[in-house]
């Protein structure tokens, strides 16, 4: 994958997250901000989830209260380089814990 393809795929990831939050009708207020390639989710309790792109490595990084994760694209899925878990699974687990209610980013 070249740099422009990586950015296109990361942009698609950001847009999906933002669209799911725009459509979400849960009780918690979750703010989504994108600034310079970094996506920040801010929760009512003051906690944050930060997702950023690491262009030199063609990785997406996820920082949550539970820890940090690095994802490589394998086929159509972003997969954690340590645990083998999917990006969406880890993001949903962290967001659910930090929001205090179930959050899904998959349509």
UniProtKB/Swiss-Prot annotation:
Q: What is this protein called?
A: Iron-sulfur cluster assembly protein CyaY
Family as reported in the entry's similarity comment: Belongs to the frataxin family.
A Gene Ontology cellular-component term: cytosol
- GO BP terms: iron-sulfur cluster assembly
Which HAMAP family does this UniProt record tie to the protein? CyaY (MF_00142)
What NCBIfam families does this protein's entry cite? Answer: FeS_CyaY (TIGR03421)
Record InterPro entries: CyaY, Frataxin/CyaY, Frataxin/CyaY_sf, Frataxin_CS
Q: Which PANTHER family match?
A: FRATAXIN, FRATAXIN, MITOCHONDRIAL
Concerning SUPFAM superfamilies, the annotation shows:
Frataxin/Nqo15-like
Molecular function, one GO term: ferric iron binding
| Signal peptide span | none
Q: Which UniProt keywords apply?
A: Iron, Metal-binding
Write out the function statement from the record: Involved in iron-sulfur (Fe-S) cluster assembly. May act as a regulator of Fe-S biogenesis.
What is the organism of origin for this protein?
A: Enterobacter sp. (strain 638)
